[in-house]
Amino acid sequence: MPQPEQPHTILLVHCHYRLPGGEDAVFAAECAMLQAHGHRVITYERNNDAGGLAQKLLLPLRAIYSTKTVREVRALIRKEQVDLVHVHNTLLTISPSVFQACFKEHVPAVQTLHNFRIFCPNGILMRDGHVCEECPQHGLGCAVRHSCYRGSRAQSLVCAGIYAFHRLLGTYRKVNLITLTEFDRSKLLEFNRKASRPVFTPERLYCKPNGVAAPNHSPLPWAQRKNQIVFAGRLEELKGLRTAIEAWQLLGPDAPQLIVAGTGPLEAWAKENAPDTVTFTGQLPHGTLTELLAQSRAALC
């Protein structure tokens, strides 16, 4: 693999979800890719386990601005002589205050936007099964009114407060932002134009699809593949698992085998309602999953 003319020291920042998901996989893959290309990678990671009662009571404030994050990231930047900070998820325990550490240390910062959360607290522009753009058009308070974040008005207030506060600080206007698709980029530019005050700097918004490491297992010739389809991802409404299970119910006993790989809140419902043509594997190691995909006819991801 070609090496860079001048390797850099890159700090990757990510707050892991309680249930492993795509953002976690992208974070790990990007870390490996940068290292493979000769860069020195440092990571700053947390999870969303708030700990004891005192920590849970302080979490709403720390989710908005974490002095711990600022202090630790500044120290890490100085100690490791970091050239660039690349942020993935900051919700909840890292907080966007990580960027203040970058600003204070005069280190460039970039964030990959895996969702629309800077305009929509639930991140997906959906409510009650329909497209919803109320927050981009009428303000973040709409999410609080509809309890959009985790079905909780209190948690929605915290989430909306995070982005409202950092709009006031102008945090995202100083950060380079990456979207995963041109559609995402166009929607964010549209929302930014309609905002009473720009949330980010348009010239700092770029599109870079997620990279994927070359699989160890090449796909088998079509004739040699098993009559099966793989559903891989977090088992939740957003990923379309309910639709897939209902489709397999309609297809009947002649349907190809659907192999569901992953865990999530919809798992119990799916197992209860799945026909015999659906099997569940739980969370699979990456190598096992790629081998399974290589011998299957299609994937639902």
Q: Over which residues does each language-model region extend?
A:
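Short N-terminal targeting/anchoring amphipathic segment
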Residues: L12, R74-I94, P108-R117
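Conserved active-site histidine-acidic residue motif and adjacent donor-binding/catalytic loop
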Residues: T67, G264-E267, V278-L293
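Acidic donor-binding loop of glycosyltransferase active sites
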Residues: A294-C301
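N-terminal subdomain of nucleotide-sugar transferases
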Residues: M1-N47, R78-E80, V98-P108, Q249
